[in-house]
């Protein structure tokens, strides 16, 4: 039986209040080494992969909440490609949307190095960190080049792990995950195959403050949210009158609202008209995002947004197979760039994401009072955006235009 490589893609996404400390982790000078054009090219390719993966999830889990981190999944798969060769490597990068004729492998790998470095660069009032950890079996002999690449290019932590003791290995990995997510994710890995010899963990941690925080006293404790034509649930509904970038896309029959975080990140709420969700999902692409970015206009909005928490866990194995990554799971997998040992193949790719949207995120934080003089007198003249039915949500990092998180909220009461 072939030894297994286990890929874990862990995401912790939080909307919280202001956090002034700089993110932990190594800071490197990455902003001058990569042309902006390359980053924008990569962000477009990554966005199209994100929407392709999203559409797979809608087929596999229809009428369910969807939430995941595209940049986390892409970065982990590119890191895995460091150790892959021949068709195994080609399938991985082509599934991500790259054409090796147009974009050589070295450009892809260095592009992601710069992307991760840019995302990890400390930003006051925004805590954003993407990281990797590699747990390698004590008897596996990884190639020096592979270890050097993942350490220097991706700042990956590497641990020597005794996988002959499954219980101890799970404890070691879960303890590391719990520590990196500040205790938010406990017991991520419940089982490991007996012949597992390597586990790759990728995580992204995000905390930010709304640029225009909501006043908790204006949150309605119970408001109707439409799940389908006949079913509603009750959710807390936040409310404010504020200026936001927004638009009505007449072609796609949806309303788009941009809510900025205080520093270098933004959230896009996409609210289709009733019965139009599938057509909007089918049209989502990097070109759609660029169109909206051009057309968004700032103006006063009477805004109602649900307060909610959702999480999602995915076994990406079957999904990645359908998308084109097949050799990595087969007996013919070629990971000779990782080790000289024969027979290594990918056994599983797991992904977990968690999100909380609220007025302030932590009880200790204060929300500024809303000055009445800053609001328009004739509120009835301004559009009402009431997010009270299924919607899509995107969270993007501004400087790289990377989609940090992507999802659909069908039922905000299903945590």
UniProtKB/Swiss-Prot annotation:
Tissue and organ distribution: Expressed by the liver and secreted in plasma.
Phenotypic consequence of residue 116 to N: Gary; severe thyroxine-binding globulin deficiency
Chief place of localization: secreted
Annotated signal sequence range: 1-20
Coiled-coil residue windows: none
Keyword Cell inner membrane among UniProt keywords: no
Residues the record lists as binding thyroxine: 293, 398
Short name of any one Pfam family annotated for the protein: Serpin
Keywords tagged on the record: Glycoprotein, Secreted, Signal
Places the protein is found: Secreted
Glycosylated position list: 36, 99, 116, 165, 253
Any single GO CC term annotated in Swiss-Prot or TrEMBL for this entry: extracellular region
Record-linked PANTHER family: SERINE PROTEASE INHIBITOR, SERPIN, THYROXINE-BINDING GLOBULIN
Role this protein plays: Major thyroid hormone transport protein in serum.
Family label: Belongs to the serpin family.
Name of the featured protein: Thyroxine-binding globulin
Organism: Homo sapiens (Human)
